[in-house]
Amino acid sequence: MTSHVLALAFLLHACTALAWQETNSRSVVAHLDSGIIRGVPRSADGIKFASFLGVPYAKQPVGELRFKELEPLEPWDNILNATNEGPICFQTDVLYGRLMAASEMSEACIYANIHVPWQSLPRVRGTTPLRPILVFIHGGGFAFGSGHEDLHGPEYLVTKNVIVITFNYRLNVFGFLSMNTTKIPGNAGLRDQVTLLRWVQRNAKNFGGDPSDITIAGQSAGASAAHLLTLSKATEGLFKRAILMSGTGMSYFFTTSPLFAAYISKQLLQILGINETDPEEIHRQLIDLPAEKLNEANAVLIEQIGLTTFLPIVESPLPGVTTIIDDDPEILIAEGRGKNVPLLIGFTSSECETFRNRLLNFDLVKKIQDNPTIIIPPKLLFMTPPELLMELAKTIERKYYNGTISIDNFVKSCSDGFYEYPALKLAQKRAETGGAPLYLYRFAYEGQNSIIKKVMGLNHEGVGHIEDLTYVFKVNSMSEALHASPSENDVKMKNLMTGYFLNFIKCSQPTCEDNNSLEVWPANNGMQYEDIVSPTIIRSKEFASRQQDIIEFFDSFTSRSPLE
């Protein structure tokens, strides 16, 4: 009798301990803090994993919740289908084009995709180890993009025993409009990211994940967001390390200046025909507008200004609002904020080549001829007194343009100033402040079958923005007709990059002590980086005269006092 009771007790314990349950060969379910969700079994290269798609991680920010910090989910009673990706957030895509499949847009876009190694599904009393978790923040200039699989296929990583989470967050006017009020405080998109990380903490074990072993990562604006989160007091204890691909909190392609936020907000209200000055009335009119109208106004702003419109902002403390960015990122870095977070950061050899067609369509050359200050990186533009802007533009023109305004010259100045300089400078700053290791790379491998170049109609030399991402995430875009079988070297490079990333996710170093299959990658000393040229050519290099020249040139501007 006693043995039967013990057996029954053990069975009951096992059933309640199961965070996961395989219901049949075509679906799996997970028990979250808000209810049960049903996902789908999948496989890649003969290795099984499970995906839970379109999982809400907070109450949808519609109606009175527009612009506000996300609120907790209401629990649901029935099993929620998580078998399809949810709608993407409202946006105007000016870059990704055919890389992104046509998707429904909605304000109700707060969804995550969770991809889990098959071995992690049924966890009984810890017989399967908790897995490390990668939370990836998509790029898109804080204006467009999504966590969908078109650019972020999880196959390369989830089949190596890492849980991969991608997600949507509010973008452009919906995510980064700031009126400096409690109802429209700004940085809503960053708060969405913090909400997602808190949700992951609460539910990690339900997915077989280790809540104490979370890596955040991002590409472009997603990398900048990830770095900003490492500098925020609001994220303490939410993650362990960060990977920054082509973006930092110091990046020159955006500015956190409240001056810019005030300027862009004023432009928006003019386009919408809102002439009120009372913040409450402005909020009421913005809330009453259909989301489509706000999205159309944002599209007009993008056409007028370029890629970047609504951006993260240094915040003033507001009652009842979680502060994400409490000071200029460069000041926070100099003070040592975030220095104990291990970083893996990188840039490509010709970042801004990816934007070439967009710049041509934008008629950039004529716009520069009409207004030379356009060549000034946004961050510098709002650090410089207005009377000195033309002088600054001429200094940049002498350095990069040699008297000829051309797309080629802009691409060069953009690559150096927007991406390479911030990465080099962050490496220097980390060496000065001490703290956790930082690993820096330059990705210069020109793949034989670059899906990015094919889809976007590019034929440039060098490696542009986004191209390194395709060796870490599988591109599952609608442009399957343009996919070619990867070359032997392409496969080797995919294995190399995923190897570095997987090691960093597991041991905070690109090369772990218990994995000798990769060449040892030394931590940065403020003057060195790994130059990834091919799967067999990876060199540790000291900053050359070219890098030193880039640092000295842009340092000469940042030494000026920023505008208040």
Swiss-Prot record:
<feature type="glycosylation site" description="N-linked (GlcNAc...) asparagine">
    <location>
        <position position="180"/>
    </location>
</feature>
<protein>
    <recommendedName>
        <fullName>Juvenile hormone esterase</fullName>
        <ecNumber>3.1.1.59</ecNumber>
    </recommendedName>
</protein>
<comment type="function">
    <text>JH esterase plays a crucial role in the decrease of JH activity in lepidopteran insects, by hydrolyzing the methyl ester of JH. It is also involved in the transport of JH.</text>
</comment>
<feature type="glycosylation site" description="N-linked (GlcNAc...) asparagine">
    <location>
        <position position="402"/>
    </location>
</feature>
<keyword id="KW-0325">Glycoprotein</keyword>
<dbReference type="Pfam" id="PF00135">
    <property type="entry name" value="COesterase"/>
</dbReference>
<keyword id="KW-0378">Hydrolase</keyword>
<feature type="disulfide bond">
    <location>
        <begin position="89"/>
        <end position="109"/>
    </location>
</feature>
<feature type="active site" description="Charge relay system">
    <location>
        <position position="351"/>
    </location>
</feature>
<feature type="signal peptide">
    <location>
        <begin position="1"/>
        <end position="19"/>
    </location>
</feature>
<feature type="active site" description="Charge relay system">
    <location>
        <position position="465"/>
    </location>
</feature>
<keyword id="KW-0719">Serine esterase</keyword>
<dbReference type="InterPro" id="IPR002018">
    <property type="entry name" value="CarbesteraseB"/>
</dbReference>
<comment type="similarity">
    <text>Belongs to the type-B carboxylesterase/lipase family.</text>
</comment>
<keyword id="KW-1015">Disulfide bond</keyword>
<dbReference type="InterPro" id="IPR019826">
    <property type="entry name" value="Carboxylesterase_B_AS"/>
</dbReference>
<dbReference type="InterPro" id="IPR029058">
    <property type="entry name" value="AB_hydrolase_fold"/>
</dbReference>
<feature type="active site" description="Acyl-ester intermediate">
    <location>
        <position position="220"/>
    </location>
</feature>
<feature type="glycosylation site" description="N-linked (GlcNAc...) asparagine">
    <location>
        <position position="515"/>
    </location>
</feature>
<feature type="glycosylation site" description="N-linked (GlcNAc...) asparagine">
    <location>
        <position position="81"/>
    </location>
</feature>
<dbReference type="GO" id="GO:0004453">
    <property type="term" value="F:juvenile-hormone esterase activity"/>
</dbReference>
<keyword id="KW-0732">Signal</keyword>
